[in-house]
Design a protein with these regions (language model features):
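N-terminal binding-site loop/beta-alpha segment at the start of enzyme catalytic domains
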Residues: 1-7, 38, 64, 70
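Acidic (Asp/Glu)-rich catalytic clusters
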Residues: 2-4, 32-36, 91-96
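A short, structured active-site edge motif that brings together acidic residues
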Residues: 6-17, 43-48
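Glycine-rich anion/phosphate-binding loops
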Residues: 18-26
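Active-site groove signature of glycoside hydrolases
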Residues: 35-51
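Beta/alpha (TIM)-barrel catalytic core signal, keyed to glycine-rich beta->alpha loops juxtaposed to Asp/Glu
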Residues: 48-223, 229-238
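Iron-sulfur (Fe-S) cluster-binding segments and ferredoxin-like electron-carrier domains
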Residues: 236-247
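Single conserved hydrophobic/aromatic residue that forms the stacking wall/gate
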Residues: 245-256
Length: 256
């Protein structure tokens, strides 16, 4: 329907889909076939962390991906990352040919001791790697704000809560792309409206975002992004993110 070069297509190699090096190419070819394309613009080693990185090394997943790039079946090889900055430093040192890194990056996690958004971003910059941003609105947490936090942003010049969160992330040097999960046409139109003629946050907006940070931290809310990975492995199929959201909402109601 549209020329292939007119859109960017990304896929990922998840560790659960291969047990040995020989499994990777057939799986990759099945991904191309499923998408009906001859190549992927980006191919990411999925969810790299201390728990699975060695599996990728043992199965020569990176070497296979680099070979696929040499064959023209992948334009850029990268990783999506979910761990501490020191682990990212090790991976980029081990594999300097990695071209792009996808990290969780938003204003609430910027200095979070567990997520380490800022530190991971700084590692990417030191290694000269462009960044793909995931979770810029933290699974909707930075859209569905507590009333007092929403009031801070409402006092600005009319942007949506999502707009301030996404512009915060996109305003840093080296950000190649900001991935925003959208579930309605209205959300897409909102994103397009402020990214078409992009402007980073000004000083007043940044101060407001910092105030929202302070409000969130004062409430001690559960830092769930609603990625739902936990539900996939739950033997009872419990909707864990919904329960955590309900718990946070109840705590917020009691504090009013």
């Amino acid at each position: 329907r549209y020329p292939r070069e007119d859109y960017v297509l990304t896929d990922k190699l998840s560790g659960s889909y291969f047990k040995k090096e020989e499994d990777i190419r057939p799986f990759f070819e099945s991904q191309l076939a499923a998408c009906g394309v001859d190549y992927f613009d980006f191919y990411l080693m999925h969810s790299q962390s201390t728990t699975n990185y060695q599996h990728y090394r043992d199965c020569r997943a990176y070497e296979t991906a680099f070979a696929l790039k040499a064959e023209g079946k992948v334009r850029h090889v990268g990783i999506s990352f979910h761990d501490r900055a020191a682990v990212l430093e090790q991976i980029l040192t081990d594999y300097p040919a990695i071209e792009v890194v996808q990290i969780q990056f938003n204003y609430l996690d910027y200095d979070d001791v567990a997520v380490q958004s800022r530190k991971c971003y700084e590692v990417c910059r030191r290694h000269g790697k462009p960044v793909l941003v995931m979770e810029p609105v933290k699974g909707g947490s930075l859209v569905n704000l507590p009333d007092d936090a929403k009031a801070v942003l409402d006092a600005l010049h009319g942007g949506s809560p999502a707009s301030y969160a996404i512009r915060f992330a996109a305003g840093f040097p080296g950000m190649l792309m900001v991935l925003s999960g959208m579930s309605s046409m209205e959300q897409m139109q909102d994103n397009i409206s402020f990214m078409r003629d992009f402007k980073p946050l000004d000083e007043t907006e940044r101060a407001a975002v910092e105030k929202v940070q302070e409000i969130f931290h004062s409430k001690d809310l559960i830092p769930c992004t609603a990625c739902r990975y936990c539900t996939d492995g739950c033997p009872k199929h419990i909707s864990i993110p919904c329960l955590l959201y309900t718990s946070d909402a109840a705590d917020e109601a009691r504090s009013v």
